[in-house]
A protein has these predicted regions:
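Short, acidic Ser/Thr/Gly-rich low-complexity loop/linker segments typical of extracellular
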Residues: 42-56
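A short, solvent-exposed beta-strand micro-motif common in secreted/extracellular proteins
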Residues: 63-74
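Short strand-edge motifs at loop-to-beta-strand transitions and within beta-strands
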Residues: 55-59, 88-90
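Short, ordered, surface-exposed loop/turn motifs in non-cytosolic proteins
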Residues: 20, 26-42
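Structured interaction patches on ligand/partner-binding surfaces of diverse proteins
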Residues: 3, 73-95
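Hydrophobic loop/turn residues within beta-sheet-rich immunoglobulin-like superfamily modules
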Residues: 60-64, 84
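Beta-strand-rich domain onsets/edges
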Residues: 1-19
Length: 95
C-alpha cells in the first residue's frame, strides 16, 4: 500500500530566515484570493502565492530589496521594502 505519512504541525526556526508577510487590503477590508508576487530589486519575478481568506500572505526570501505586488479582480497594488534576517510585516493596499 502506498500512502503519504501522517502530517502534523511543523515548526520552522525563523531566527536565521528572511520572512516577508502581511495582508492585502481594499476599501478597509482584507482581500481573499488575491495573487501576491515577490519581485527582486531588478523587478525579476521570484515567487507567487494566493492570499488566505483573511488576505494574508507569506514568503521566505533572501535578505535584500523586495517589491510585493498584488493582483486581484478589484485592482492591483504594490509596496517595496528592505528586508534583512527576521520577520517583516507589510501591507499591500489596492486602490
Amino acid at each position: 500500500m502506498c500512502a503519504a505519512p501522517k502530517q502534523g504541525n511543523t515548526l520552522i526556526e525563523v531566527g536565521n530566515q528572511t520572512v516577508i508577510q502581511g495582508q492585502v487590503w481594499h476599501d478597509g477590508a482584507p482581500v481573499a484570493g488575491a495573487y501576491v508576487r515577490l519581485l527582486d530589486a531588478t523587478d525579476e519575478f521570484t515567487a507567487e502565492v494566493v492570499t488566505s481568506p483573511e488576505g494574508e500572505f507569506r514568503f521566505f526570501a533572501a535578505p535584500g530589496e523586495w517589491k510585493v505586488r498584488s493582483l486581484a479582480p478589484v485592482g492591483r497594488g504594490e509596496t517595496t521594502l528592505s528586508a534583512g534576517v527576521g520577520i517583516h510585516e507589510t501591507t499591500v493596499k489596492i486602490d
